[in-house]
Structures are given as structure tokens and as C-alpha cells.
């Protein structure tokens, strides 16, 4: 099981803050700003200006490019109630000093204390605790499989719904 989500920066400047506000996205708060705006800077490396490219590979690997970070993230089980989350950051030998500095700065976006990854880690911990607590039980959530595919936005549950369809097939349900 695997999937790929790619977000490409539009060639025409768009007001993404307005789009988030219009959809009442909880994390969109007026008045908040980064102390270091360069954290979200980007140097174009590929033909398309890709801001996010995330490829989860079941059961425990995620290969991702967020802005200029290149990361392989592994979830390593350490027993029924523990796991280790390992981040491998990459760069290229021929990176310019500016690119290397940007990659190091943007490592603060992802990783164990990253601005983005904190929620992922917390969600994984919640699943781990629930699995240990209710290991002899099972549940079924349809995840709205009948919902139409929505591919014009990344603000969707389509990928996770499709993952669970594939997982059910893999597990013989």
C-alpha cells in the first residue's frame, strides 16, 4: 500500500490564507506569524515548484520533500506499547551553501520537534495507546467510502479513506 500526494505552487500568486479562512480551517489564525519567514522560503530544484511531495509506503515508511527538505521517516515498533520515530535528512553533495543552509533551517519544519511533525507524532502515539489498551477488540469505521473522490484540494480525507480500503483488503476483511 502506498500513495503519493504532491502540492505544486501555482505560477500565478494566489491568496491561500483567504482560502483557508473561507473553509474555517482551525489552524488559520489572523495575527500569527513566523519569527523567521525564511523557514518557508524555497529554492526551485525541479521543473515544477513542488512545495510538498509525500509518499507513505506501508507499513512504516514515509518519503517526503517539504519545500527543500528531503526526508525518509521510519516508524520502528519497539514492543506493544512503544515505537521509535526516526528521521533521515538528506541533501546533495553539490548543494550550494545557500541550499545547504536552507535545508538545515527547514529541518525545523519536520523531525521530532518540527512545526509540522508534532501532530503526526501525537496521532501515532494515540493509535499506539489505543491498540495496546483495546488489543483484544476490534472496530469498524466506514470512513465514508461512498464519498466522491476530491482531487482539486489537499484538504480532504480521500487518501486516508483509500488507505483503509486497501488495508481492509490486505487483512482479508
Regions found by a protein language model. Name each.
Residues 1-173:
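C-terminal catalytic domain of Rieske-type non-heme iron oxygenases
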Amino acid at each position: 500500500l502506498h500513495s503519493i500526494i504532491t502540492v505544486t505552487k501555482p505560477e500565478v500568486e494566489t491568496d491561500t490564507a483567504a482560502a483557508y479562512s473561507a473553509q474555517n480551517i482551525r489552524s488559520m489564525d489572523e495575527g500569527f506569524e513566523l519569527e523567521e519567514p525564511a523557514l518557508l522560503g524555497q529554492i526551485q530544484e525541479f521543473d515544477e515548484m513542488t512545495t510538498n511531495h509525500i509518499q507513505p509506503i506501508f507499513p512504516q515508511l514515509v518519503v517526503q520533500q517539504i519545500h527543500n527538505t528531503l526526508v525518509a521517516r521510519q516508524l520502528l515498533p519497539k514492543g506493544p506499547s512503544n515505537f521509535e520515530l526516526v528521521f533521515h535528512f538528506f541533501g546533495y553533495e553539490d548543494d550550494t551553501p545557500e541550499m545547504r543552509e536552507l535545508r538545515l533551517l527547514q529541518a525545523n519544519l519536520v523531525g521530532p520537534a518540527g512545526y509540522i511533525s508534532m501532530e503526526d507524532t501525537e496521532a501515532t502515539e494515540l493509535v499506539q495507546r489505543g491498540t495496546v489498551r483495546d488489543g483484544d477488540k476490534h472496530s469498524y469505521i466506514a470512513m465514508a467510502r461512498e464519498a466522491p473522490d476530491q482531487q482539486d484540494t489537499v484538504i480532504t480525507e480521500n487518501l486516508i479513506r483509500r488507505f483503509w480500503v486497501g488495508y481492509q483488503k490486505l487483512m482479508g476483511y
